[in-house]
Structure formats: C-alpha cells, structure tokens
Regions:
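Conserved, structured core segments of small domains
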Residues: 1-110
Length: 110
C-alpha cells in the first residue's frame, strides 16, 4: 500500500497533504495557560504566513469528541516539504508535546 501511495502522490506536484496537529493533552483547547495562549497566537501567525505564501489551503480546530485537534491542509511539492512546513511551526518547535501526523491526499476537488 505504501508503494502505491508513493507512486500516486509523486505523480502530482504540487501535492496536497492532510496534516493533523495533535496537542499535548486532550483538553488543551479548554485549559490553555497564558504562555500556551501566546504560543497559539504565534502558531496562528505562522499559519497566516503560509496562507499568504499559497502553501496552506485551510486550517482550523476540529471538534473531535475525544478532544480537539488542529487540521492543516497544505499544497506543497513533496511530503518532505510538508514535513518541513510542520516542523517550522512554533508549536512543533516549542518542545511542549505537540506533534503532527501527515498524510498525502490521493485526490482533491477544489
């Protein structure tokens, strides 16, 4: 299956990636400290920059009953490019337990 996905997504450039930002705790969105709020403001500023650059299509929190998480849809060249974008996010660099899961979209309707 991985080989199939690699071939399918390699054929399209730029490619679209579904990036899921998993916060450090399930209730994070409801229990932010002032320091975490400032970090989230830096995160939002970073995402706005990606939107201006044309690398981000949409982003926002998802109301998952198990706990909110962040959705980021990127349109970049490769999965390595998507990883570089997510690794550049202030929340990912913060060392506070945020992590991204990145999956290529097999197709998109835009």
């Amino acid at each position: 299956m991985d080989e199939f996905l690699a071939k399918e997504t390699a054929a399209r450039s730029p490619s679209v990636f579904h990036c899921r930002l998993i916060p450090p705790r399930p209730d994070f969105a409801f229990t932010l400290t002032e320091e975490e709020r400032a970090l989230m403001n830096a995160h939002v500023d970073y995402l706005r920059g990606l939107l201006r650059e044309g690398r981000m299509m949409i982003a926002g929190p998802v109301a998952d009953p198990a706990g909110p998480w962040g959705l980021l849809i990127l349109q970049v060249g490769t999965e390595a490019d998507a990883r570089a974008v997510t690794e550049g996010d202030p929340v990912a660099r913060s060392g506070r337990g945020f992590r991204y899961e990145i999956l290529p979209m097999m197709s998109t309707i835009m």
